[in-house]
Amino acid sequence: MAKKLVGSMKLQIPAGQANPSPPVGPALGQRGINIMEFCKAFNAKTQEMEQGAPCPTVITYYQDKSFTMDIKTPPASYYLKKAAGLKPVGKRNRPRGAETPGRETVASITSKQLREIAEAKMVDLSANDVEAAMKIILGSAKSMGIEVKG
């Protein structure tokens, strides 16, 4: 007999840094998911990724308290900020894009860097080839105030 699906949830967790403290612990605990089991499984699956990179994760949980997780690649904005070399600013000490995209340019990247980002994100994008993926990432770059040269 198949497991009975109870629900699913989305979390963005830094790679290799899942721990029982907030926000991960309470979000899982109130749904009856074994927190330590999840943290160990997540950290094992993300050990090959860059540590600290935000990983969007879809967690599906079942009536018998078991779960499955689908870990996606970090957001395009993470790769773009890293490639552009944006420095952390503001209260939360995080890198930021332009306040008025289209009028203001905060940084620039090369088309080679754009291609590398598109190739890394290809598995999560609904693009048929790398050229289409590059156009999607280019749109994200423009909306952040990052110019693509070359």
Curated annotation (Swiss-Prot):
Explain the post-translational modification: One or more lysine residues are methylated.
What is one term from the GO cellular component aspect held by the record?
A: cytosolic large ribosomal subunit
Give the intrachain disulfide bonds: none
InterPro entries from the xrefs? Ribosomal_uL11 (IPR000911), Ribosomal_uL11_bac-typ (IPR006519), Ribosomal_uL11_C (IPR020783), Ribosomal_uL11_C_sf (IPR036769), Ribosomal_uL11_CS (IPR020785), Ribosomal_uL11_N (IPR020784), Ribosomal_uL11_N_sf (IPR036796)
Gene Ontology MF annotations: large ribosomal subunit rRNA binding; structural constituent of ribosome
State the UniProt keywords alphabetically. Answer: Methylation, Ribonucleoprotein, Ribosomal protein, RNA-binding, rRNA-binding
SUPFAM superfamilies (alphabetical): Ribosomal L11/L12e N-terminal domain (SSF54747), Ribosomal protein L11, C-terminal domain (SSF46906)
Entry annotated with the keyword Ribosomal protein: yes
Any one of the GO BP annotations? translation
Presence of the UniProt keyword Nucleotidyltransferase in the record: no
Q: Which domain of life is it from?
A: Bacteria
| CDD domains hit by this protein | Ribosomal_L11
Q: Cross-referenced PANTHER family, in alphabetical order?
A: 60S RIBOSOMAL PROTEIN L12, LARGE RIBOSOMAL SUBUNIT PROTEIN UL11M
Q: Which HAMAP family match?
A: Ribosomal_uL11
Q: Which NCBIfam families match?
A: L11_bact
**Protein function:** Forms part of the ribosomal stalk which helps the ribosome interact with GTP-bound translation factors.
Question: How is the subunit organization of this protein annotated in UniProt?
Answer: Part of the ribosomal stalk of the 50S ribosomal subunit. Interacts with L10 and the large rRNA to form the base of the stalk. L10 forms an elongated spine to which L12 dimers bind in a sequential fashion forming a multimeric L10(L12)X complex.
Give the record's family classification: Belongs to the universal ribosomal protein uL11 family.
Q: What is this protein called?
A: Large ribosomal subunit protein uL11
Q: Which organism encodes this protein?
A: Jannaschia sp. (strain CCS1)
Q: Which gene encodes it?
A: rplK
